[in-house]
Regions:
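Copper-binding active sites and cupredoxin-like electron-transfer domains
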Residues: 2-355
Length: 355
């Protein structure tokens, strides 16, 4: 009886092994469908071919968003200006939050951005010290949002505990102080998610006596976690990776350049800014009229701001970028094209030759 049971078990195991072996030899004969390359026309007119999945913004239940980094870096929103009876300058701004928009951040790569006034970053708000700032905020998003400004203001204007629900409105009011380069962003939890998706912008407070003449630019340093794994896939100055590498920023030699640099990078503890071919005076947060140093390299933590002032002695193409190699190779690399005059320069080195 025992031997019979053992024999039956051995026969069962033998059949199972043979069956598995048979399956093993059958599997290779199965034809696996190959991925079919797709041709895709981006909104910029570039045609790409890919075997991966392409998210078509037209078919996505959201609003496609175009963003121009060249325009953004030179745009300052001074608000609607009026004068109160006591002589105070009132600046009124209208900011709308949305969270259903799609931006093509790289050819064929689309990202669900959350925006202030249909832009990432949001508008650069600018005022003079002592001005009364009044911001009419509307939330047209599907999630609660708010506005939190760095600077000096009353607790009820801090935008932390009073989140604004869908369809809600709130008016923020405070005086522009102190002088410097500040930051504003959504402060609804999880704050990391709201900032990473794009709800932030720069806020500049000028001194009453004004600033020296300069060619001014705004650079908001950010990243994009396009696969939502808590790590950035792209890095940039003003959202679009490699933009200013392919579209050099034209400046004049011996002209003072003033760069307002704001770091809003999430998921990475620090970011940095390295300038080629010259050095800059830097003013942390721009709150002091005396520069804290003269360098070609800055390291910034999350939320840090710096005002940089510099000029180029010699004409040519100069790079500025993150000295963290990973960041620069994933998009945070840009260029200045210094010309002898703003209108006419016989460039000895063609940009296309360098690429």
């Amino acid at each position: 009886m025992g031997r019979s049971i053992q024999s039956s078990k051995m026969l069962y195991i033998l059949i199972l092994i043979v069956g598995v072996s048979t399956l093993y030899f059958v599997i290779p004969s199965v034809t696996i469908a190959e991925e079919t390359p797709q041709t895709f026309l981006t909104h910029t007119g570039l045609v790409i071919t890919t075997t991966g999945d392409v998210i078509d913004p037209i078919g996505y239940d959201g609003k496609a968003l175009d963003f121009d980094p060249a325009k953004f870096m030179k745009s300052f929103d001074y608000g609607q200006v009026s004068v109160l009876e006591d002589g105070t300058i009132l600046r009124e701004f209208y900011i709308t939050a949305r969270d259903d928009q799609i931006m093509e951040v790289s050819p064929g790569v689309f990202y669900n951005v959350w925006t202030f006034n249909d832009s990432v970053p949001g508008p650069t708000i600018r005022a003079t010290e002592g001005d009364l700032i009044r911001i009419h905020f509307t939330n047209e998003g599907s999630k609660p949002h708010s506005l939190h400004f760095h600077g000096i203001h009353k607790a009820e204007m801090d935008g932390v505990f009073e989140s604004i629900g869908t369809g809600g409105k709130f008016t923020y009011e405070f005086y522009a102080e102190p002088v410097g380069l500040h930051l504003y962003h959504c402060h609804v939890h999880p704050v990391e998610e709201h900032i990473a998706h794009g709800l932030y912008g720069a806020y500049i407070v000028d001194p009453k006596e004004g600033r020296d003449s300069a060619d001014e630019f705004v650079f908001v340093l950010n990243g994009l976690d396009t696969d939502f794994d808590g790590e950035n896939n792209f890095y940039a100055a003003n959202t679009i990776p490699f933009y200013y590498q392919h579209h050099p920023i034209e400046i004049s030699t011996n002209q003072k350049i003033r760069a307002y640099v704001v770091n809003v990078l999430e998921f990475d503890a620090v970011n940095n800014f390295h300038l080629h071919g010259t050095l800059f005076h830097h003013y942390p947060a721009g709150t002091d009229s005396v520069p804290s140093g003269y360098n070609d390299m800055l390291t910034m933590s999350q939320g840090d701001r710096q005002i940089l002032e510099f000029s180029y002695k010699y004409p040519g193409l100069y790079m500025f970028h993150a000295h963290n190699t990973e960041f620069s190779e994933k998009g945070w690399v840009s260029t200045f094209l210094a010309k002898e005059t703003a209108d006419d320069f016989d460039n000895k080195v063609e940009y296309d030759d360098i690429i």
